[in-house]
Structure formats: C-alpha cells, structure tokens
Amino acid sequence: MFNRTLTTILGIICLLTFCFADEKFSSFRELKKISNGMSIIHTSDSKVGIVAIHGFYPAYWIGIHHEWVQPFNYLVKNEINTFFYKYDWNDCPSSVAEDFNVELNDLIDKHPNIDQWQVVGHSMGGTVVLFSILNSEFNENIIYNTVATALHMDIDKVPMTTRMSIEKRFEKCPDNLNSFDGAFSKGFKNKLVQWRNIKEFDSQFKKYDFDPYDKEIKNSIVVQFPDSLNGERVGHTSSLYFAILEIVN
C-alpha cells in the first residue's frame, strides 16, 4: 500500500474552480430525474472518461445526488467525458456491482476513443466499486477510485441510531464490507485509489468508536485528505469534489 498526502497545489486549484464553476446543473433535482442504469452526463473529444457511482441515501434524505452537482459542473466545464451510474441503493452492493460491470464493459465498447477510464464511487458507491474490481478482468486503462468509503464495519461500535439499519443490511447482504479480508490481503488485479477522510471530520463516521478507514488493501494507493483545504472542511460530501479535482488535474 502506498500513502500520499495532498499538497497546497490542490488547495489553490480548489479555490479557482469554486469561483469559476460551470452551472449545467443548478440543482440535485435534475440529477434525481435521471433513470437508473448508465447515463451520459457529457461527451467530448477528451481521451478521459469519468464514471460516477453514487452512494446510499436514507429515506429521510431530501438532497439526493446533491454531492454530484458541483463535480459534474466542473467536469462538463473542462470537457471531460462524464457518465453517471444510478441504481437502487437498497439492493446489495455485490448485486449492483454485477450489473455495473456489464454496463461498464458496454460503455467502453461504445467509446473506443476514450483510452483512460476513471471509475469513481462515493461512500457506498465505493463499496460497489470494491465488488466491481473484485470481479473484473485486468484492464490497464481503468483506474478504480473509492471516496469516503468505509473498508470494514464493527457493528457493535456503531451508534445505536444507525446500528439497526446496518445490521439489517448485513443480514440481507452476506457479501458485505466484512467479506473482503482475503481480497484485501491479496490486492486486486486493477489499480485502486482510495480517497480517505480523517474520521473525526467525516460526518458519516465521526461518532463511530472505531475508524472504518483503518484497513490495508495490498498495492492500493491511499490519498489522505487533511481536515480542511483553504478553510473548507473536508467532510464526507465535500471530499468527493476535492477527489474529482485531483483526478482530473
């Protein structure tokens, strides 16, 4: 496993891009209307393609896909081929990954002009990425990315407010985060980059009595975000935008 830390250059890039964002999408509502499956956000003559995978949304969550608005606007402005894979987040990530792999292979076949693919899964979308890469053939043109994604779950140390829902999901999905130990120790055939937050600054995990990021995946690259960049807290949602900036630049 290789560890990297971000430099102040990323902070400067972030400051500039916040000021000059292209507003193709003004609201999460536009993304919410997109059907499940693989959808085109933007196409261009670029040789790079970004494939986005969203995470889990609780029943009470209003701003579904809000975290993707700013990254998508940035990618569109910079003429990057961008695709969005949507799915039913109540399904098991392992099952979702099976469909995703079919869709990804079809997408690659349809866009032979793209010679570098970046698959980016945020939060539970990163779990889908892990199951995807687990069952993927080697392809040197694909880099898999997990952003703000837990690598293991100690259910007994999760706050009671969320413990029951996690227990139900794990009972429903025997192939879950805690199924990867053997795979993590061996590593994956394809390149994997983990974009990790500091647990105490991640709204999703800060109340956990353990660090869900604290797990080694052999031969993966780890990018550890600081607690803030240019005064902007790097949290569970904002880390997605920072990761996209670094991937593109």
State what each model feature region is:
Residues 51, 83, 145, 193-196:
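Hydrophobic/aromatic beta-strand patches that form the interior of the parallel beta-sheet core
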Residues 58, 97-189:
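Serine-dependent carboxylesterase/thioesterase catalytic core
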Residues 167-171, 175-249:
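C-terminal catalytic-base region of ester-bond hydrolases, centering on the histidine
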